[in-house]
Structures are given as C-alpha cells and as structure tokens.
From Swiss-Prot:
Subunit structure: Homodimer.
Name recorded for this polypeptide: 3-hydroxydecanoyl-[acyl-carrier-protein] dehydratase
Provenance organism: Mannheimia succiniciproducens (strain KCTC 0769BP / MBEL55E)
Database matches in NCBIfam families: fabA (TIGR01749), PRK05174.1 (NF003509)
Pathway: Lipid metabolism; fatty acid biosynthesis
Length: 177
C-alpha cells in the first residue's frame, strides 16, 4: 500500500491530472491508472472525500462535458446518436478504481461486477454536462484492495442511470485474475 501522504491527494482533479493518472504518474508506479482518452469518461473530478456519500465511507463526484463530436456519437447510432449506456457504467467503475488509488491502494484496477443497473434516460449530443456520483459502501484496503459502491449518472440536472454494488478490485498479480 502506498502511503497516502506521499501521493498527490487532493479533493479535486483537473483533466491534466486525470491524464497523468492514465500514464501512471498520479498515484505512484504501483497505483491504479485511469484509461487514456478516448475511453477516459470524465473531464474533471470535482469532489473526493473519505467520509461523505450516502454511507459515510467515501464520495466521488466527476463531470464530463458533452460535445457533439465525441467519438461514440458518430457510430452509436448513425442518424440516432446516443452515448452508449455501458460507457456511463464504465465511468462509474473508473471512478471507484480512482478512489482506491486515491486512498493509497496499489495494483491494476479491474471491474468485478455490478448488482443492478437502471437506465431511465439518455445522453444525446445536445446535452451539456454529465455528472457522475459515487457513494462508497465498503472499502477493503489490505492485501486485497476492493471497493463496493453505488453510483448515479446525471445529465443536465436529471438522474438517468443508477447502479448498485459497483465492485472494483486492484490486483498485484494479473495471472490470478
């Protein structure tokens, strides 16, 4: 486990910070990485803490600015552009993994599952901003590093996706996964 005091542990992160995470520079050489663009599904993290959220065990809030030229609008679907729902789900997993690195967890992050996902709206190229909110329910930070969280995706003020029991683990040895 990395000493969180040696990390660049802040309560918010810019796009440049997130790019540094994708290169493995933010949480140290053994810390988890975010994916690089175009799979990086957020532009900034605006709030992180270890005691907030619906369960008092941690909270992450991030934003994605919607631009009509985002890669998925050109192919999903031609003539009927919509952000794939799986990308919103992946963004929530990305943020759980980011949180695990933020608290000092080490290893390569992998999504391990989700309890239930509900879609009640869509993200169109006319939207302006997506907000992701992650409410940590349980964090294991020992030899096994794992986070369990609930999440939601909001577009322009309306919650359109919810997910329960988002599970992400950090692995030291990928041969066991």
């Amino acid at each position: 486990m990395t000493d969180s005091c040696t990390l660049n542990k802040k309560s918010s992160y810019t796009y440049e910070d997130l790019l540094a995470s994708s290169r493995g520079e933010l949480f140290g050489p053994k810390g988890p990485q975010l994916p690089a663009p175009t799979m990086l599904m957020m532009d900034r993290v605006i709030e992180m803490n270890e005691t907030g959220g619906n369960y008092g065990k941690g909270y992450v809030e991030a934003e994605l600015d919607i631009k009509p030229d985002l890669f998925f609008f050109g192919c999903h679907f031609i003539g009927d552009p919509v952000m794939p729902g799986c990308l919103g789900l992946d963004a929530m997993w990305q943020l759980v993994g980011f949180y695990l690195g933020w608290i000092g967890g080490e290893g390569k992050g992998r999504a391990l599952g989700v309890g239930e996902v509900k879609f009640t709206g869509q993200i169109l190229p006319t939207a302006k901003k997506v907000i992701y909110r992650i409410h940590l329910k349980r964090v294991i930070n020992r030899k096994l590093v794992m986070g369990l969280a609930d999440g939601e995706v909001e577009v322009d003020g309306r919650v359109i996706y919810t997910a329960t029991d988002l599970k992400v683990g950090l692995f030291q040895d990928m041969s066991t996964f």
